[in-house]
Amino acid sequence: MSDSPIKYRLIKKEKHTGARLGEIITPHGTFPTPMFMPVGTQATVKTQSPEELKEMGSGIILSNTYHLWLRPGDELIARAGGLHKFMNWDQPILTDSGGFQVYSLADSRNITEEGVTFKNHLNGSKMFLSPEKAISIQNNLGSDIMMSFDECPQFYQPYDYVKKSIERTSRWAERGLKAHRRPHDQGLFGIVQGAGFEDLRRQSAHDLVSMDFPGYSIGGLAVGETHEEMNAVLDFTTQLLPENKPRYLMGVGAPDSLIDGVIRGVDMFDCVLPTRIARNGTCMTSQGRLVVKNAQFAEDFTPLDPECDCYTCKNYTRAYLRHLLKADETFGIRLTSYHNLYFLLNLMKQVRQAIMDDNLLEFREYFVEKYGYNKSGRNF
């Protein structure tokens, strides 16, 4: 697929780790890597405008195939001129395949070789999603980067189940490639699965790499395994993927996990974490996690994070944010969401600089100590 619309350019490798600085070229522009991608589930990053996302340095956003297929419908979005036009976002968009939502949200699902039958979580109607249908929906959405339809088994499933699952995922990937109608302007990634089993990850990666996708995703992590287990899987999985293609770790957004993923050679990450926790007043700051809704901040007239220069921190106090959230004012959620997204995008900017300076391990140590991971066990 040398004529793929998605190209990865390696700029520099970090001397002491597997980290790499690069950029990904897409039909809607180029973004630097490693990059965190804000999630716009329903064709919007909750409470944020496209202008704000650009302002905070978001070079690409993610949207969910499953949700947009159910509402408003992929054909309607195609009639609107595609997802970019529909949501007024002129930069790159990545869409997932819908697979993860089918396994996590839908009821009474039944997986066969053909695809997955499940109950729509909105109205209970029976639906069917196949590899071909997942590709067709994404072709209608017109995202720059698409995902193959895969099964995402739980991390602790038995070996025999996971083996059958990855073999089916490989067959589904092949079917998806054949069904792809727009390879000239949409790049399709294969998704490596295999839970915690090294030989199954190897088999899955081997199958997918032989199909020559423009990029590869690492799926089936951040689904309940420990941080150490995730790192162990990344240690052996990224090495199985080609150096000249992007590597995307799906569903990961905790700050230490982002840094540890980069150390192991990952280029792209996404997660709903920053906006989800912002809605209950939990904020990521340079000093660690802070729940601004707590009573101790009622008369705290300092910025949310004194070291942050985002719009929220430059203009509003902890006391004001607490007041807005306690009063259920949407503006409060907008401000905490803006800050959390900015925090992760800025973290990745610092990580890119650390790769440039060959001191990523020192940066990790400094960040982890300051954030308070060492004091309080894992948190986000």
UniProtKB/Swiss-Prot annotation:
Species: Streptococcus pneumoniae (strain Hungary19A-6)
Transmembrane spans: none
KW Cytoplasm (keyword) present: no
Molecular function (Gene Ontology), one example: tRNA-guanosine(34) queuine transglycosylase activity
Protein name per Swiss-Prot or TrEMBL: Queuine tRNA-ribosyltransferase
Gene from which the chain derives: tgt
GO BP, sorted A to Z: queuosine biosynthetic process; tRNA wobble guanine modification; tRNA-guanine transglycosylation
Entry EC no(s): 2.4.2.29
Listed NCBIfam families: Q_tRNA_tgt, tgt_general
Pathway connected to this protein: tRNA modification; tRNA-queuosine biosynthesis
InterPro entries: ArchSynthase1/Queuine_TRR, TGT, TGT-like_sf, tRNA_ribo_trans-like
Active site: 96 (proton acceptor), 270 (nucleophile)
EC top class named in words: transferase
Binding site for substrate: 96-100, 150, 193, 220
